[in-house]
Amino acid sequence: MTMEAVDLSDAATLTSWTRTLNEDDALTLVDNAFAGMSIDAWTELADRLLPQAGAARRRELIRMVRDDDVVASAWLRLFQDGNPHRRVGLLYGRLWWNRPLVLRALDELVHPALERADRPLPPYDADLIEPDVWDRFVRAALRPDVPSEAFAKTRSTVRGALRSVGVLEISGNHGRTCRVQHGRPDPLAFAWVVARELIDRPEQSEPWAARKSFAARLFAPRADYAATCLDAGVAAGLLRRGHLMAQSRLYAGPGMLMGGAA
């Protein structure tokens, strides 16, 4: 699960997204990764741990989770020492970075709806994303020849990804009702995602971290909660504050740079 830049300029050529990662399986696989362990040894162990009967599905799940090596990173330490809320935030803070449809849905659906809902005296159902809006979004993102079954599964998968980070509430069994909401991620999970991005963007302002960073886009916290997360990250050594021309700046902290950031 490496964090690399994603080019959305050609998003309309995407194929469907129908294969999903079982959250419990992913948590189990990462829990059994230890610093110094070879990838081959981890893969062999992971194959034994997964309950799926089919070898092809086990290989697919392992491929979704694996990285190039197992190191004593800040991410692994926080994950294995963390509570369930933190572990889920860390997992999806890495996993969804490389999913263009998640990023696009956040920017085109979730944040515009939150902006409408946060206005004084918002319109009725301002937080609602209507079914036809979902359909237009998915249709614009995928190739025109995607079968209807794959179209429906992709729509469901994107919704599930947004729900996993707390920005979408889904209700109803037949007609799905989807409402946006501000996420409340574990503070250190949020701070880690900010700090990881700061390794590639060496210096940014606190307003950027709270509103424009990938973590802010993904979890969509309110400004006061984002500030709390950043304070927690500084206290834990994931982030470091500095000042430039009387402006507070953020940098990746010493806790990110020892033993490998990822």
Which stretches of residues belong to each language-model region?
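Short, low-complexity, intrinsically disordered N-terminal peptides in bacterial proteins
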Residues: 1-3, 259-262
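Eukaryotic partner-binding/assembly regions in large regulatory complexes
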Residues: 1-124, 129, 133
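Hydrophobic, Leu/Ile/Phe/Ala-enriched alpha-helical segments that form helix-helix packing faces
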Residues: 65-69, 113, 138, 142, ...
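Generic amphipathic alpha-helical segments used as scaffolds and interaction surfaces in large
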Residues: 93-97, 145, 217
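Eukaryote-skewed repeat-based solenoidal scaffolds used as protein-protein interaction platforms
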Residues: 106-173, 181
